[in-house]
């Protein structure tokens, strides 16, 4: 894999990380708007995404892995997203994406539609204000699995349907071009793929 097949995210990027990312043509996904000036010191990414904190998050495995919401330390908070994309556009970047992390180990199918709606409201307003479009939207992960016998598994079909319904409605509401939708299944694929033997 290389180039735009790779989305490069990181919290603590070194100058070398940035230079190698620019040289290889990967998609830069910035976790903090303050990283943009550092990246621009070395060059201009062809495609830029920000990790948007939708202002709400949930975790079924403890509050320290909530990943989104008012107290989360990751992602661009809702009130700073417009300024982040405005700065990127002003710097001459023309191709954009958006990313979020909705939470961790969520097994409530309707939650994914809800959190997608929050993200779409934020970036829909950004797109309309700045007259930019989003080539892709990475809805992150958070797809949960049961860890105890009494826990119900995630209904993945219902989660997909809820997400698609909300996404279509918001695209129409904000007059957005349909983006490529992506997810990061992570734990959902590998979390129950083996046994821990002690």
Language model region names:
Residues 1-24, 38, 60:
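N-terminal active-site wall of soluble small-molecule enzyme domains
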Residues 4-10, 26-30, 48-52, 95-102, ...:
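Hydrophobic faces of well-ordered beta-strands that scaffold small-molecule active sites
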Residues 24-25, 32-94:
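Conserved anion-binding
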Residues 87-107:
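Gly/Ser/Thr-enriched, mixed-charge loops and adjacent short helices
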């Amino acid at each position: 894999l290389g180039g735009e097949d790779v989305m490069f995210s990181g919290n603590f990027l070194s100058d070398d990380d940035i230079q190698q990312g620019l040289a290889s043509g990967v998609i830069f996904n910035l976790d903090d708007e303050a990283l943009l000036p550092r990246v621009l010191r070395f060059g201009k990414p062809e495609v830029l995404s920000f990790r948007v904190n939708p202002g709400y998050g949930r975790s079924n495995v403890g509050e320290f892995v909530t990943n989104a919401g008012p107290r989360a330390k990751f992602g661009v908070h809702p009130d700073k997203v417009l300024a982040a994309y405005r700065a990127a556009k002003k710097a001459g970047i023309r191709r954009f994406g958006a990313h979020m992390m909705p939470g961790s180990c969520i097994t409530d199918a309707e939650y994914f539609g809800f959190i997608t709606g929050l993200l779409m409201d934020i970036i829909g307003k950004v797109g309309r204000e700045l007259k930019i479009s989003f080539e892709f939207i990475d809805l992150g992960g958070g797809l949960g699995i049961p860890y105890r016998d009494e826990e119900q598994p995630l209904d993945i079909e219902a989660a997909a349907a809820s997400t698609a319904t909300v996404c279509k409605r918001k695209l129409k509401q904000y007059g957005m071009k349909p983006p490529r939708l992506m997810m990061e299944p992570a734990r959902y694929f590998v979390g129950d793929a083996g046994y821990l033997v002690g």
